[in-house]
């Protein structure tokens, strides 16, 4: 058995860049949430956005609808407890790529499973800000980081009121 199959986390925020998971928590109401097997939607009032997602067997489409004008961020983490993940951004192709080596959680616990989960995130907006991070340290303009714990990439872009962003 393997852990997380090389998962990653994609988080949207508005107005302030918060990279660490414990700092980007936000309030939500289940009354503002819709969940079906084919669609998920939630309104995040503190982030001034609605996040929507639909999926296929190996991909997903995210739509973020911003309720007011300002600066929006997407934060992406390779979820590697062992600090073996890697992530990079290609700003010309408007693409974020990464991988996360998978480790066993039952027989042979902690040993490498022999494969990695890979991910690609395509975005459409022109960026006004991007970089990498490790823990609370930001590295503006840096395009790749890897093989350490609590790493990721952030991208920032300007949005207009009621603008929708597809990822």
Where are these regions (language model features)?
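Accessory carbohydrate-recognition regions in carbohydrate-active enzymes
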Residues: 1-167
């Amino acid at each position: 058995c393997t852990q997380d199959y090389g998962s990653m986390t994609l988080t949207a925020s508005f107005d302030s860049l918060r990279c660490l998971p414990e700092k980007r928590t936000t309030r939500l109401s289940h009354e503002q949430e819709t969940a079906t097997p084919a669609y998920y939607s939630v309104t995040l009032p503190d982030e001034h956005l609605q996040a929507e997602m639909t999926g296929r067997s190996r991909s997903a489409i995210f739509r973020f609808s911003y309720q007011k004008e300002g600066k929006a961020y997407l934060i992406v983490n390779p979820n590697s407890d062992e600090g073996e993940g890697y992530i990079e951004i290609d700003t010309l192709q408007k693409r974020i790529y990464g991988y996360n080596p998978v480790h066993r959680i039952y027989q042979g616990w902690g040993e490498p499973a022999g494969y990695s989960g890979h991910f690609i995130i395509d975005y459409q907006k022109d960026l006004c800000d991007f970089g990498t991070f490790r823990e609370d340290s930001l590295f503006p303009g840096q395009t790749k980081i890897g093989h350490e714990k609590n790493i990721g990439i952030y991208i920032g872009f300007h949005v207009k009121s009621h603008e929708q962003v597809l990822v």
